[in-house]
């Protein structure tokens, strides 16, 4: 790329990107954010690696580990934002390293501009994993979780996992159609135990990861069945901002203790988290404004919300509009959950609740906490990284692994507080009470962990 063109690009990007505060969800409506394929990432990632290694002798160059990224249009080119792990080789050269160093993992953020197959590195921010993480947990970070981990299992590892797998099958009442499928699931289970260990090593909170009812599912199966990719791909209906309130929040709050939250539900093998998040919010709003707690129908939204995509995902903003346009929600007892799409059977005469509007909340977590304490449970969306293996405790995933750019699961904020001086959000999930802490997930509060503050919303009941 010519020097003049480089300068023009830099001036453009500095005026539009670098000098602007980075929002929690950075893409405008006409832009896209997604998990790019390895093929799309290959060229910009290799270029960033070459720039990182520039001037290094053979044998001292880092190698590329895991990569994830997003892209947006930039004039006639593309701007790639990459998050990558680099593996640094051991260093025994006293002229380079005063003390011998073992192999280490480095976390990097790059911005690469691509135009006419030419690349320009605009930003590089790298630091060793242990510099940021070992203060939270004593662990060996050579086992850092590759996001594209396809390494072969250690020899005989599946055999060693067989007793645990047998216990898993008994605990969760698993049966398989053939011996071959059982063997395959054992292999998946064994690989998942390695993944859970790596997630555990990099969690900065008190969360424990391990065997759950999802431990025999591949990562792809889990994402396809239980998560909601539309949350990161579509913008949905615009909502008005919530009216300002007193931003002073009490030290802790829990709507479960105040009767505003129904029992934990189970979405089953259906990506309908969006419906459960919204009905949970409406249940709380109706209770606070009418004094009655009713368990409301998610199935009505699967069947009758024609904008969202039922088990293939949906957006809370669209669901609120559907409830308002339909004329309300029936109860769970009257319109029971089936876990798949059926013909819409809604009857306005059977509706027990209605909403007047919906609002979008601030991305400031202190304001979210104040709104929750004063107004009720809140529909939010998060990046579900690690939740496949979450058992209990306060999750605080390493940010590059639980990026707010890749939210894929809608849930319900019901409270907040502190455990052992660690601030948390109490989150009602929709995977049944046999997951997590009796169906609940506890996530670190105060840093926008996993994008918890990026899509907070609520119905309005007058």
Swiss-Prot record:
- Enumerate the glycosylated residues: 35, 138, 173, 345, 356, 418
Q: What is its EC number?
A: 3.4.22.41
- Name the keywords, alphabetized: Disulfide bond, Glycoprotein, Hydrolase, Lysosome, Protease, Signal, Thiol protease, Zymogen
Which SMART domains does the record cross-reference, listed alphabetically?
Answer: Inhibitor_I29, Pept_C1
Q: Where in the cell is it found?
A: Lysosome
Q: Which InterPro entries match?
A: Papain-like_cys_pep_sf, Pept_cys_AS, Pept_his_AS, Peptidase_C1A, Peptidase_C1A_C, Peptidase_C1A_papain-like, Prot_inhib_I29
Pfam families from the UniProt entry: Inhibitor_I29, Peptidase_C1
Respond yes or no to whether keyword Protease is given for this record. yes
- Which N-terminal stretch is annotated as signal sequence? 1-19
Instruction: Give the primary localization class.
Output: other
Entry GO CC: endoplasmic reticulum; lysosome; plasma membrane
Query: Which reaction is the catalytic activity of this chain?
Result: The recombinant enzyme cleaves synthetic substrates with Phe and Leu (better than Val) in P2, with high specificity constant (kcat/Km) comparable to that of cathepsin L
The catalytic residues are: 273, 409, 429
Task: State the Gene Ontology BP annotations.
Answer: proteolysis
* One GO MF term attached to the UniProt entry: cysteine-type endopeptidase activity
Q: What class of enzyme is it?
A: hydrolase
Q: Does the keyword Signal apply?
A: yes
Q: Superkingdom of the source?
A: Eukaryota
Q: Which residues form the propeptide?
A: 20-248
Q: List the disulfide bonds.
A: 270-311, 304-344, 402-450
Entry's family note: Belongs to the peptidase C1 family.
Instruction: State what this protein does.
Output: Thiol protease which is believed to participate in intracellular degradation and turnover of proteins. Has also been implicated in tumor invasion and metastasis.
* Name of the protein this chain belongs to: Cathepsin F
UniProt organism field: Mus musculus (Mouse)
User: What gene is this protein translated from?
Assistant: Ctsf
């Amino acid at each position: 790329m010519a020097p003049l063109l480089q300068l023009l690009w830099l001036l453009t990007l500095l005026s539009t990107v670098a000098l602007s505060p980075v929002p929690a969800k950075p893409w405008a409506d006409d832009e896209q954010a997604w998990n790019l394929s390895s093929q799309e990432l290959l060229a910009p990632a290799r270029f960033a690696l070459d720039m990182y290694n520039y001037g290094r002798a053979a044998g001292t160059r880092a190698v590329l580990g895991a990569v994830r990224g997003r892209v947006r249009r930039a004039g006639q080119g593309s701007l790639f934002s990459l998050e990558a792990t680099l593996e640094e080789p051991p260093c025994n050269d006293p002229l380079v390293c005063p003390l011998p160093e073992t192999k280490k993992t480095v976390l990097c953020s790059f911005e690469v501009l691509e135009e006419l197959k030419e690349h320009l590195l605009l930003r590089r921010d790298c630091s060793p994993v242990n510099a940021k993480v070992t203060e939270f947990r004593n662990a060996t970070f050579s086992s850092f979780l590759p996001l594209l981990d396809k390494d072969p299992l250690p020899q005989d590892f599946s055999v060693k996992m067989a007793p645990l797998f047998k216990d898993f099958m008994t605990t969760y009442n698993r049966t398989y159609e053939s011996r071959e499928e059982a063997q395959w699931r054992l292999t998946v289970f064994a690989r998942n135990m390695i993944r859970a260990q790596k997630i555990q090593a990099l969690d900065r909170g008190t969360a424990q990861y391990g065997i759950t009812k999802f431990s025999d599912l591949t990562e792809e199966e889990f994402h396809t069945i239980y998560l909601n990719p539309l949350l990161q791909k579509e913008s949905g209906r615009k909502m008005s901002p919530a009216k300002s309130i007193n931003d002073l929040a009490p030290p802790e709050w829990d709507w479960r203790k105040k009767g505003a939250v129904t029992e934990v539900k189970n979405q089953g093998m259906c990506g309908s988290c969006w419906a459960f998040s919204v009905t949970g919010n409406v249940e709380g709003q109706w209770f606070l404004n009418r004094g009655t707690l009713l368990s409301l129908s998610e199935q009505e939204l699967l069947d009758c919300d024609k904008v969202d995509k039922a088990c293939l995902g949906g957006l809370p903003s669209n669901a609120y509009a559907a409830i308002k346009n339909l004329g309300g929600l029936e109860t769970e007892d009257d319109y029971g959950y089936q876990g798949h799409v059926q013909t819409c059977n809604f009857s306005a005469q059977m509706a027990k609740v209605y909403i007047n509007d919906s609002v979008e909340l601030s991305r400031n977590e202190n304001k979210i906490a104040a709104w929750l304490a004063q107004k009720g449970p809140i529909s939010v969306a998060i990046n579900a990284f690690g939740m496949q293996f979450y058992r209990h405790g306060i999750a605080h995933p390493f940010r590059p692994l639980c990026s707010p750019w890749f939210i894929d699961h809608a849930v319900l904020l019901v409270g907040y507080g502190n455990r052992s001086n660690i601030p948390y959000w109490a989150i009602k999930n929709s995977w049944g009470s046999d997951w997590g802490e009796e169906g609940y997930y506890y996530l670190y509060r105060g840093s926008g962990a996993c994008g918890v503050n990026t899509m907070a919303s609520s119905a309005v009941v007058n």
